[in-house]
Amino acid sequence: MTIDEIPPTDSPSSFETHGDTLDSELAGEDQALSLLKQTDLRAQTIEELSKNPALLKSRKVKLAIIGHPRTPRHVSLALLRQLFTFDLMQVALLPVAAGDIKKAAEDALINRLESVTLGERLSLARRSSGRVAFVLLCDKESRVATEALENPRLTEGLIIRALNDDDAAPHLVHAVCHHLKWSARREIRAALLRSEHIPLSLAVEFMREIPTEVRDEILRSSRLAADAKAYLQNENLSASRG
């Protein structure tokens, strides 16, 4: 994800891009954005831009400062606290942002999830980073969890981790069970078979796709009810004899 392109300004520049001074009071949004496209911009210049209250009214400028490879860490972290929810999402997805800054943006976003609207959570579930989508798999609203399963950044490992959580909601288990892509993965099926919320009919179907040598281990660690386990064990024995 990249910051919106801004056409270069025709007005005279108020900056000395590689000098020791910067008249940040005269900096306009277009000039600042043009300057921040320079990958070799000095950290001191970026910090001066970040101290201009007029410039910081522009979300594009804030995002450009945070995403610049030479922005001092303390400047980026301070600006993160000023961002709106979906701007935090954008920072977490910026390929040019430092890893620790992206993680800080994710942390800030995750901390806000309980206070954002259902509509915002639905949008975040599909569009956010994999780490945020993982948290939204555990949302109390089934629609949010279902939407998170469509996130292109969500991985098999994150889904298995969510399913293995003792507090995994029934609606998450059911959504994964019926998801065309994820329910076909063998490791995900194994995780589903360890959940007490998997429907017995699907448990029987999925167990047949699991290699015989690992079925017993899955049943031993499964949280399924005792009668369901017994039924699957009998099915397993029957399959082995057959």
Language-model features: locations:
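Alpha-helical scaffold segments
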Residues: 1-242
